[in-house]
């Protein structure tokens, strides 16, 4: 039995920190022969609104922009020689959606970036990475710049 995960979930928002996490996840997946899955979540509060409350063109542009972010991340990983087994786009609270998807696909590791929020802001609002670390069923690797 290997101590390495068979499935890795990379959570991305397209940020610089997430790009570094993507490079890390791709390296780990390649070196451990693990499947790599990538998720991008259309974050609240937009995701909690009924899409019909937006002009159809506005909602379509939002969704397309978010899908493009996911496609760009997958493209960069594949261009650097990595392989992506699955790409997932969803909407909702990013922390909750990441944890749920990790469980659904049986991920053995979640990899994500962390933004450098100050202590006061983090105390007031929390962070996606903090919440995922607390609630995930598997180890979480938080990559910092």
Region locations from a protein language model:
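Small/aliphatic-rich secondary-structure junction motif
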Residues: 2-53, 86
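A short acidic, glycine-rich active-site loop
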Residues: 55-68
